[in-house]
Amino acid sequence: MEPIIASIGKGTAMAFDVSKINIPLGFGCMRFDGRADDTVDIAQVSEMIDCYMEAGGNYFDTAWAYPNSEKTLRKALVERHPRDSYLIASKCVAWSNCTCKEDLEAQLQETLATLGIDYLDVYLMHNLGGTRTASFEKYDAWEFVKSVKERGLAKHIGFSAHCTPEELDAAFRPNTKAV
């Protein structure tokens, strides 16, 4: 099977082979609250989103753990553009503020409600690798994320990682379940 992600650059796009989705370049939403007082300029973010979409972009990356991100994305994107004109990826966090499996479901429901949408296009386990991997295993996040897709709350599932190749290899040791 060909790699799921193709190179990114001028005139190229990421391609998800199984879904035929093409993404010219993603729009990261982690730092919307960059002001000293942690407020967000919704008009400025709306303008940024409009420029990005006019240039052909449609993929927005957020996470439950990003302060103000989902709330801002709802106001600047969801309430202003048709749902079929964009893709939203969000992430579950098993290693922070998670004390039981039910916390993962609560995160998901909060994400959907805050964004004001019924489903995510992509749902990822956030920042897999290193010591965080144990939390994903402890709360059975692999099965949880799989169930999110099975319930129609996400079209695609996966993980994100900010770790060394060795840590990522360890996260996929033989006893890890593939989803």
Predicted regions and their residues:
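A short, structured active-site edge motif that brings together acidic residues
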Residues: D84-S96, Y123-H126
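Glycine/proline-rich, positively charged
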Residues: A36, V40, D50, C98-V179
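N-terminal binding-site loop/beta-alpha segment at the start of enzyme catalytic domains
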Residues: E2-Y86, E150
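Conserved beta-strand positions
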Residues: F27-C29, T62, S90, V122-M125, ...
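Flexible cofactor-recognition loop at the NAD(P)H-binding site
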Residues: F32, A65, A94, I117, ...
